[in-house]
Structure formats: C-alpha cells, structure tokens
Amino acid sequence: MISLFHGLFLSLILFILGLTSLIVRRNILFMLISLEIMMNAAALALVVSGSYWKQSDGQIMYILAITLAASEASIALALLLQLYRRQRTLNINALSEMSG
C-alpha cells in the first residue's frame, strides 16, 4: 500500500507539472490538457486521503471529479473546435489581438 506522504507528494508533483505547463504553453489545447492534469492530481489526492483514513468518501469524490472533468473537457473541446474553425489558430497570443 502506498503511504499518505508518497501519494500526496505524487499528487503535488503532478499538480505543479500541470500548473507549469499551463503557464508556459501558449496553445489553448495544451492549456486544456494541463488543466486536466491538475484536476487529476487533485482527484488522486482525494483517493489517497480516503484510502489512508479508510473512508470511501475519497473514492466517491473521485468519481464526481472525473465526471466534472469529462463534462468540462467535452465543452471545452467543442468551443476549441469552433474557435479553430473561425480563427484558424489556437495560439492564445494571436487570439488576444484585436482585429478591426
């Protein structure tokens, strides 16, 4: 069984990896992937904490977090598809410039 420290440390590393990628990347699709990594890191922390205290609440919250992440990802991908069809780019810097 994995210890609480190691599980939370892995979750922290994944969260920092996602946050760093979110800050560094300029492509909206990669930013969405970074957000998904961060959400999965938080869900991992819930499962590890629930397992440590022998409570099933962490696993129930994990199921909730995964369903929320799936719905968020599907809506975001639909919006990204429409954005790409209109602008022909997913670069956040090109999209933030005003066209007139």
Curated annotation (Swiss-Prot):
Its main location: membrane. GO terms for molecular function: NADH:ubiquinone reductase (non-electrogenic) activity; quinone binding. GO terms for cellular component: NADH dehydrogenase complex; plasma membrane. It comes from the Bacteria. The chain crosses the membrane at residues 4-24, 28-48, 60-80. One of its GO terms (biological process) is ATP synthesis coupled electron transport. Its EC number is 7.1.1.-. It catalyses: a quinone + NADH + 5 H(+)(in) = a quinol + NAD(+) + 4 H(+)(out). The keyword Cell membrane applies. It is an enzyme of class 7 (translocase). InterPro entries: NADH_UbQ_OxRdtase_chain4L/K (IPR001133), NUOK/Mnh_C1-like (IPR039428). NDH-1 shuttles electrons from NADH, via FMN and iron-sulfur (Fe-S) centers, to quinones in the respiratory chain. The immediate electron acceptor for the enzyme in this species is believed to be ubiquinone. Couples the redox reaction to proton translocation (for every two electrons transferred, four hydrogen ions are translocated across the cytoplasmic membrane), and thus conserves the redox energy in a proton gradient. Belongs to the complex I subunit 4L family. NDH-1 is composed of 13 different subunits. Subunits NuoA, H, J, K, L, M, N constitute the membrane sector of the complex. PANTHER family: NADH-UBIQUINONE OXIDOREDUCTASE CHAIN 4L (PTHR11434:SF16), NADH-UBIQUINONE OXIDOREDUCTASE SUBUNIT ND4L (PTHR11434). This is NADH-quinone oxidoreductase subunit K. It comes from Buchnera aphidicola subsp. Schizaphis graminum (strain Sg).
